[in-house]
Amino acid sequence: MKKLIVLSIVTALLVSCQQSSKYESVANDPMKSRIYTLDNGLKVYLSVNKDQPRIQTYIAVRVGGKNDPRNNTGLAHYLEHLMFKGTTQFGTNDYAKEKPLLDEIEQLYEVYRVKTDPEERKAIYHQIDSLSYEASKYAIANEYDKLMAGIGSEGTNAYTSYDVTCYTEDIPSNEVENWAKIQSNRFKDMVIRGFHTELEAVYEEKNISLTDDSRKMYETGLSVLFPNHPYGQQTVLGTQDHLKNPSITTIKNHFKDWYVPNNVAICMSGDFDPDEVISVINQFFGDWTPNPAVDSLRNALPKTCEPLTSPDVREVYGPESERIMLGWAFPGKKDKEADYLDIIEELLYNGKAGLFDIDLNQAQKVLSAGAGSYALTDHSMFITIGMPKEGQSLDDVRALILSEITKLKNGEFDATLLEAIINNMKRQQMQQLESNSSRANMFVEAFVNGVDWKDEVERIDRISKITKDDIVRFANSVFTDGYSCVYKHKGVDPNEKKIEKPAISPIETHRDKTSQFVTDILNTKVKEIEPVFVDFDKDMSVAKLSNNNELLYKQNDVNGLFNIQYRIARGSKADKYLSLAAEYIDYLGTSKLTPEQLQSELYRLACNISFSVNSDETIISLSGLAENMKDVVALCENWMHEAQSNQTVYDNLVADNLKARADAKLEQKNCFLRLRRWAMFGPLNESTNILSAEELKATEPDELLKHIDELKNYEQTIIYYGPMKQEEFTEFIEKNHEVSASPTATIKGDIYKNIPTPKNQVILAPYDAKNIYMIMYSNNEQKYQADLIPQVELFNEYFGGGMNALVFQELREARGLAYSAAAYYTVPEFKEDEFTFYTYIISQNDKMGDCIDTFHKILNDMPATESSLLLAKEAIMKRIATQRTIKRNVLSAYIEARNHGLNYDISRDIYNKVKNMSLDELVDFQHQYVKGRTYTYLILGNEADLDVAKLQSLGEIHRVSLEEIFGY
């Protein structure tokens, strides 16, 4: 009998080994991918990348908004949220007692969702709220996030689109088994708990989308082009009515139907042994039961849509600036003709040499124009967007866009552009291969869209064989008169509804409790990974050039890409004309090249040149294929010092700038950014220190260019990352980059300083929306101290840094007050400056008071638990142990350290000190540096919808206009 048992075990092991050795691969695959299919249909995509001991993981479920029931739109998305709530084994301290309450909540929602009488609904919701509180007594909030923090995962998140729901983790390479055990339990045994508070978080996400006018345009375009397909019939976030009337039963059925192995792919890129990884995945996911009906469910969607025969014009309204979008139906990403979509996108709009770039943007015929694909699995929408100049109608913009489409159809483009497109695709591929997330995401895209990996590997080679005649023929077949035309107007959206907040009792979170499942995972011993700290003396070089400028050098021995930066110690605070000059030069040619030729040459070389100006320095960046570096450096020199001024171009730029300034006041996020800078730095800040309209009009464009040319006279640091050896690069750059023999030194760190907050006050700026953006900002003038950084890191991790932190639990999990909330003790950019502290939240207008009260409570009486401290410490320690500062990041790390007066990697101090920090030390930090602070409350919102009495109780209210915070 024993022999039979042993034989069975050996046989099972052999079968497992045989299964793990069966995989698909493709010749000449730069990622050397392995693709496995388990017996239950689960797809596993693996690619090894040894850059650092971490692994990017994506678990992709081939289901999204298009698969939502017509009467439960938004379902796939809020199931994504619920997947973080745990299982029967974690997220609970007694599932047997919790389950009857959860079942009762489920049944009440089935009654609630069909009731229309407001009083009846309120009474039922009160029952749901009461039961939810009782159920929370047996739940443990955020145990999934505790698990991820405990194993050192980063980037815990998920996303839902029309075609996929995908779950992301970036894990240490020694935690594969723990990760697999957690995920298999999560995907087989999901439990819906904390439902009504999470639904409020989803609704807050919906509120944020209501001021996203671009989203409205895309959704309207889809509805026109695909009226018989879910792409056009429903949205990923769902309707307001459906979100407020959910069905837990329907969500469970959705999970049962779609979250099955033969509809899922595990996609991984990083440092691992693929044989070991597939064995672990087979161990934990191999017994997952498939659903034989999932293919028929997927195939139930309509395959074709009746094409339009004439333009279908729609109008949408919202707070942002006017624009127009034209859209054409294209084949889906799984179609071979999708190759044409990629190349047409580049021909029309690539940022430099496309038809839109040259004929519309460079020629300043519109404020801005762009084109690109909204590529989906079953169908795609090719979109063009245009924003009008001052006095220009949307119809004028429409005509200009259509004229460029006609040029494409007529073949009125240079055939050599096709070769340049291929070179740029190769450059983009090199960049993607450096990133584990990009590599793993390519797997997700292939799986979701049903694309054979061989086709993906051969994509660039295949596209390179497409001829100009092929493109013209295809363009004429798809760019017909049957297109969607969406006019976006400024105004109130009639489809929006104002919904009052529900009465929610904060649920129990039990931060001090831990389920046995979590305890077992956290106690599992894994082989330690030792940290490797960057050594600036060994991992890079610092040298002085002949003119005493500095060179920071790091060799790229990975691929054929280069990066050069000229960081010039003169910024907008010293010269407010620089920003305008950097913008102006983008429209100009040189003594050798017209503006169009210059941009086309850059694109042909597959390289970039950019000018950016911040308060203390100007950065000129060059990047691209290393084989073309010398040509690009020469082009940049010619551009900087011999740009050909043009009065007409400048006059157009001024007019467009004034229009763009007016438009900026219409965007909620932009308004909040300006409010934040105004309140934190004062009326004179990076945003307001700009030329007035009168100064713009009075400026002589010839004089403006001198501000760029004269940058050569100022001290600069040259940063190089590329294949060239240091001696060779030094000789080359000294010979080919024009600089003064005796550059003028400028004070480093000439930036705007944070304003102290000696007393509480409220600064209120107007914006008419369903939600507020709010920051509580505090500066008690505490100067930077390097020895305080470990405590700061630990406090941020514990208090406000992520989904396992206190802020997330109290504001979102327990109360459903926000989709996004955070708090940070911030480290200044320079050693001369101060630490500051802020909280941040986006919430429905009538939840403002609750948000403020909750922040006050946890800021001044911070819950302190040993288990949460240990998790915060573990997360920091594992993150540092497995992160590697490599490639161009070494140079960035050096600059950051030097700005703080350090000559070493501060991560070493954090790692060595955090491991020994106690709960008492954390509480002492909170008492000394956080508790009892005074704040400036920054609020962007509609005052008519806010509790002004609450604001008055906080401190004096200062109402500021958009004109004040924008400076015009």
Segments (PLM) and residue ranges:
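Sec-dependent signal peptide recognition
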Residues: 2-8
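A common structural junction motif
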Residues: 185-192, 284-292, 402-413, 638-645, ...
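Proteolytic maturation boundary segments
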Residues: 7, 16-46, 273-317, 322-323, ...
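Hydrophobic, small-residue-rich alpha-helical packing segments that form membrane-like cores
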Residues: 194-199, 212-216, 220-222, 232-234, ...
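Short, conserved charged micro-motifs
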Residues: 176-179, 274-278, 336, 392-396, ...
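Active-site His/Glu-centered metal-binding helix of metallohydrolases
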Residues: 75-83, 581, 795
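M16 family metallopeptidases and their MPP-like homologs
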Residues: 47, 52-65, 74-76, 92-185, ...
